Every structure is written in structure tokens, then in C-alpha cells.
């Protein structure tokens, strides 16, 4: 593992703790780090009070929810593919990784990883489809995207240290599933090395490559998505501060849950009692002397209130440090200017992430087009995160501009699409073709009506028709 990757992992660990799929289980497995043992929590006679506190702890997934909502806002609308071969829209976008993952699902996951660790990557690879029958034509290479998370990075190498130097090697870790016995299976750690025009695969316990082969491209087909770039293949998690607050919330919540668990059971005190019975409960009674006193001792609720207030404060801090406007909403009255400033700040972060993702998708499609040998499409990700719906008067003004020829019909449809007047499942290209056809039919109908009117209209210079009495034509007057 490269030293650069090793250093970045130190910052990634806190993010991995609060965003991993295992969630609370991961913190339980690493409780000595994230929920340290207190001095008096000493295991004795098989009882470990610290382990009891760990077992009651639960992680509130604040950071994970922040990231998921941020990615959802960026990809609120489906990614649009313009131009290129129809194969991209008809087939590829439905399965971009060879396992049935759609383009939108794949892009959302890549963006979530980038917002978590500061960057994410993908490898553009291709496989050859063999003809099913002898007479079938040879199918061109079928490209697909391979997701690579920062936690898989092992290292990279470039030609030199100059800016823009060519990437000559990229190494990352993966798990290979192998059969074990008749019905079982096992996972083996392996390192994949990609160099221009070739790849190699090494298993953890074997010094020689277990698999190797050529690549159709003469460069390393790696595409990176940055959210907090520090350098080439180097980034820092943008939500690290929020992650530390999330861990602080986890610790305080663990203390509160454990305290409530202990304090919920009161302690029975018997004064001047000489008996030996120690069993109490709803089905038991205690025989006491007339001078014996019995009462329950309970904890003061003031300490619990203070812990609950601290938890509320931590939750508010996490909300205010969120990068999305949804999770940063304030449930108090605000001025219009304050709301506008918050909106612009949120849009700035989301727009930057959207542009990074859009550039990465276009670069990936360019590489996939080289594999396929066809023209790649252009991916367009909506930059509108305001949920702003066009008003009726806005649509009327835009329609007037389109009729006067100041904007095109295609632009009008795009504005109405982003303004949520055109449903998302409507094909804009098909809609444009239908509108043009309707306009041509309406124009033709108007021309036909004009010709028909010209045929029945009196010729120019002809005398007006006389009335039946032979005089001038009778005029009708309407009294007002």
C-alpha cells in the first residue's frame, strides 16, 4: 500500500465508522476505540459492565442520511443522454455494470461514496460476447463500469511528478468469490494491477499472478469523481467534522441508554429489618416489624435531562453542518434574504458535485465508446436543485417568445421539463417531433382555408352585386 493511501485512510476511518453498511455492528466490533472503557468498568466474576454498555449502544445514522439526501437531490431527475448511438439509451443505461444496475443507480452510489470519502472511482472495462450460433455476426465489445471505492485503493504510479502526467499503473483490492466444497463458497483477497493495455491479478497468498490479460485501450481506463480534491488520487472527506459529531452523539446516547437501563429499576430500602428474605416482586410480600420502614430509592432525573439536552444540541450542530438544504432546514421564522443565502450556499455545493459527476460520466462514456467503436452520448445532469415549479404566467411568456421565434421549441421544452410542467417519463425528442408535426398540420390547414376563402371571394375590380330590385345592395345597420 502506498504511503499516500495509508495517510488518507487515517481520515477515512471516522467516515467508514459512521457510513459503513454494518453501522452499529461495526462500532460494537471496535468499541475499544469508539466507546472506551471507563476506569470503574472492570470485569468481575464473569460480569463486564462495559460490555453491557456497549451492547445497549446504537448509532444514529446522521451522516449516512445527509449523504444519501445530498446525492438524491443531485440526481432528483434522471441523467439525460443526448446524441451518440441509440444503443446507449436503449440498452446500456439499463445495465452499466453487467449485473443489471441502471445508470442512475450506479451514478448515485458513486456520488455517495465521493461525498463520504472525498472521491470515488470507476474502471471502464469491456468483455467480448461470443456468437451463439455459427452464422451469427460477431458482437462488438460490450463495455461496462467497475466501481472502485477509496477503501480499495492500494496505490498508483505516474510517469513523473509533473502536472497532467500520464497514469502508468493503478492498483486496488477486491474480493474474489470461489467455490468451497460441493455447496460452500469463500472470499479471497486479491490485488488487481492495471497498466496500459494489460491487467494482472494477484491473490494474497500467492506471489505469482493468478490471472492476466490484455486491455483494448492503450491507457489506464480510470475515471475519478472528486468532492474534496487535494491532488490527483488524493482527497479528504468533506463531512469529517460532522462524522466526529456523530460519534460524540453515539457516545452520549450510549451513556444515556445505559443510565436509564440501570436507573429504571428502583432500589428497595428496609430500615430496622431483621428478616432474611431478599426476594421482591409483584407476587411477593415482606413481613416486617411495626417499626420497620420501607421505601424506594430512585435516581435524580436532572442528570438525564442534561444528557438529553446535550443530545439535542449535537443533533442541531449536525443538521447545521449538513451540506444539503433539506437537512439544513430551520424550523424557525427567517427573512427572505436569509433563506436565499442558505439556498445559494446549498446550491453551490450541490452544483459542484453535480458538475464533477457529469464530467466523470462523460469521460467514462468516451472510454466506453472507444471499446464499442460507436459515438458516445453526452450525459447531462440537472443543475436545478431549487424544486422551483414554473408558474402559469411564466409558461405564457415563454410560449410567446417561442411563437415570435426568439427561443426554439426545443429550448422551451427543456425549460418546461426542468420547471416540472413536463413529466419526467416524457421523451423530449419524441415530444419535439410530435409538436413539429402538429404545427405543420395546423399550417397546412390554415393554407387550405385561405385557398378556399380566396376561391369564393369576388374578384378585384368587379361590380358589387345588385339587389333583387335592381338598386344598390341593401346595407344592414346594427343599432348600438
Give the residues covered by each predicted segment.
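Extended, helix-rich architectural segments
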Residues: 1-143, 148, 454-455, 459-480
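Long, hydrophobic, amphipathic alpha-helical segments used as structural scaffolds
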Residues: 107-111, 126-130, 253, 257-264, ...
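Short amphipathic alpha-helical segments
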Residues: 88, 99-107, 114, 241, ...
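Extended, charged amphipathic alpha-helical segments
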Residues: 206-338
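Conserved aromatic-histidine-acidic binding/catalytic patches
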Residues: 51-55, 59, 76, 110, ...
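C-terminal helix-loop subdomains that flank or include functional centers
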Residues: 274-277, 306, 313-480
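Residues in well-ordered beta-strands of folded domains
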Residues: 123, 171-173, 287, 380-386
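Extended, regular secondary-structure scaffolds
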Residues: 115-228
Amino acid at each position: 500500500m502506498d504511503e499516500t493511501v495509508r495517510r488518507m485512510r487515517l481520515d477515512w476511518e471516522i467516515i467508514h465508522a459512521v457510513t459503513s453498511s454494518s453501522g452499529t455492528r461495526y462500532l460494537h466490533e471496535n468499541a475499544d476505540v469508539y466507546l472506551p472503557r471507563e476506569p470503574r468498568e472492570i470485569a468481575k466474576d464473569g460480569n463486564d459492565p462495559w460490555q453491557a454498555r456497549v451492547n445497549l449502544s446504537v448509532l444514529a445514522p446522521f451522516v449516512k442520511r445527509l449523504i444519501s439526501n445530498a446525492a438524491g437531490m443531485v440526481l432528483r431527475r434522471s441523467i439525460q443522454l443526448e446524441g451518440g448511438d441509440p444503443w446507449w439509451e436503449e440498452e446500456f443505461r439499463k445495465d452499466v455494470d453487467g449485473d443489471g444496475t441502471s445508470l442512475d443507480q450506479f451514478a448515485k452510489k458513486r456520488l455517495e461514496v465521493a461525498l463520504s470519502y472525498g472521491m470515488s472511482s470507476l474502471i471502464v472495462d469491456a468483455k467480448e460476447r461470443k456468437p451463439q450460433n455459427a452464422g451469427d455476426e460477431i458482437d462488438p465489445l460490450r463495455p461496462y463500469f467497475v466501481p472502485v471505492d477509496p477503501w480499495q485503493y492500494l496505490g498508483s504510479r505516474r510517469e513523473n511528478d509533473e502536472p497532467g502526467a500520464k497514469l502508468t499503473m493503478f492498483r486496488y483490492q477486491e474480493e474474489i468469490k470461489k467455490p468451497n466444497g460441493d455447496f460452500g463458497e469463500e472470499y479471497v483477497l486479491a490485488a488487481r494491477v492495471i497498466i496500459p493495455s494489460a491487467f494482472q491479478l494477484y491473490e494474497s497468498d500467492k506471489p505469482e499472478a493468478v490471472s492476466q490479460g490484455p486491455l483494448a485501450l492503450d491507457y489506464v481506463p480510470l475515471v475519478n469523481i472528486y468532492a474534496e480534491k487535494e491532488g490527483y488520487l488524493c482527497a479528504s472527506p468533506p463531512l469529517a467534522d460532522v462524522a466526529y459529531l456523530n460519534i460524540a452523539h453515539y457516545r452520549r446516547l450510549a451513556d444515556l441508554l445505559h443510565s436509564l437501563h440501570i436507573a429504571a429499576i428502583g432500589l428497595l430500602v428496609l430500615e430496622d429489618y431483621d428478616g432474611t428474605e431478599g426476594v421482591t416482586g409483584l407476587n411477593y410480600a415482606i413481613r416486617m416489624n411495626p417499626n420497620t420502614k420501607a421505601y424506594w430509592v430512585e435516581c435524580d432525573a436532572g442528570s438525564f435531562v442534561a444528557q438529553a439536552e446535550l443530545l439535542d444540541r449535537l443533533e442541531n450542530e449536525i443538521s447545521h453542518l449538513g451540506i444539503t438544504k433539506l437537512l439544513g432546514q430551520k424550523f424557525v421564522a427567517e427573512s427572505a434574504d436569509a433563506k436565499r443565502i442558505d439556498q445559494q450556499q446549498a446550491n453551490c455545493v450541490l452544483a459542484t458535485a453535480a458538475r464533477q459527476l457529469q464530467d466523470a460520466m462523460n469521460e467514462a462514456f468516451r472510454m466506453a465508446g472507444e471499446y464499442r467503436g460507436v459515438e458516445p452520448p453526452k450525459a447531462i445532469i440537472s443543475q436545478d436543485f431549487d424544486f422551483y415549479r414554473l408558474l402559469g404566467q411564466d409558461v405564457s411568456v415563454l410560449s410567446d417568445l417561442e411563437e415570435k421565434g426568439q427561443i426554439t421549441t426545443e429550448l422551451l421544452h427543456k425549460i418546461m421539463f426542468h420547471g416540472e410542467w413536463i413529466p419526467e417519463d416524457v421523451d423530449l425528442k419524441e415530444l419535439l417531433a410530435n409538436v413539429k408535426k402538429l404545427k405543420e398540420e395546423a399550417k397546412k390547414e390554415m393554407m387550405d382555408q385561405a385557398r378556399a376563402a380566396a376561391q369564393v371571394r369576388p374578384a378585384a375590380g368587379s361590380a358589387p352585386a345588385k339587389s333583387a330590385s335592381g338598386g344598390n345592395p341593401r346595407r344592414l345597420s346594427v343599432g348600438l
